[in-house]
Amino acid sequence: MMIMNNFDEKKLIQEFSKIQSELSPRIKLENNFQIEEIQFIAGVDLAYWNVNKTKYGTCCIVIIDYGTKEVVEKVYSYGEIPIPYIPGFLAFRELPLIIEAVKKLTKQPDIYFFDGNGYLHYRHMGIATHASFLLNKPTIGVAKSYLKIRDVDFIMPENLKGSYTDIVINNEVYGRTLRTTKNVKPIFVSCGNWIDLDTSTEIVMNCINNESRLPIPVRLADLETHKMRKKLMEG
């Protein structure tokens, strides 16, 4: 499917909605792995910039050793972004660069973290969930800001490290508001695929240090994408 800049947004939304509707019944919010066997965790993030009227993006994937938290690999991709930003359909814009970066990996992550949502999405198809079907790996969404769905606000958790409140919409748990660090704003965790919410929370908390409220792989991927964007813009 090739989509050029002269897009018909209505047709794109129809096509993208159809794909999301076909994939969403295949989501499994249960672990397909043993947590003791996790060795490598990847963080994925993207950054964008404009050159004249053309949008460009860069994706960075950082892999850490789950035990030592040391970085074991970093890869990048970059290129033109022909697909416009349409709320609820971010995956279609970001996945080409993500897949290009994944192809460069020499290590095989056991789990991918995404700077964004997974099940916490209008159709349960945030970037973390959508990407799982192409990566064939468990995924977790970690968002810095809250995606408000059906006018439901999140409930602020206690000001204690590890405290959380579930995000419940129409009697269904979509995700979790998690305070990873005391006296710091919470983050929003949601399952991507092939993992449950309690395990997602445990793994996120095991990747928190004193430097950020974000888990280490996500924070490092965020830093690297901004460095790469600066380098590419200056080059």
UniProtKB/Swiss-Prot annotation:
GO molecular function: deoxyribonuclease V activity; magnesium ion binding; RNA endonuclease activity, producing 5'-phosphomonoesters; single-stranded RNA binding
Record-listed E.C. numbers: 3.1.21.7
Cofactor requirements of the protein: Mg(2+)
Keyword check for DNA damage: yes
InterPro entries recorded: Endonuclease-V
Binding-site list for Mg(2+): 45, 115
Pfam families assigned to the protein according to its UniProt record, in alphabetical order: Endonuclease_5 (PF04493)
Classification via CDD domains: Endonuclease_V
Keywords: Cytoplasm, DNA damage, DNA repair, Endonuclease, Hydrolase, Magnesium, Metal-binding, Nuclease
Primary subcellular site in the record, as a coarse category: cytoplasm
Annotated catalysed reactions: Endonucleolytic cleavage at apurinic or apyrimidinic sites to products with a 5'-phosphate
Family per similarity comment: Belongs to the endonuclease V family.
Task of the protein: DNA repair enzyme involved in the repair of deaminated bases. Selectively cleaves double-stranded DNA at the second phosphodiester bond 3' to a deoxyinosine leaving behind the intact lesion on the nicked DNA.
The protein's name: Endonuclease V
Annotated organism of origin: Bacillus thuringiensis subsp. konkukian (strain 97-27)
Classification lineage: Bacteria, Bacillati, Bacillota, Bacilli, Bacillales
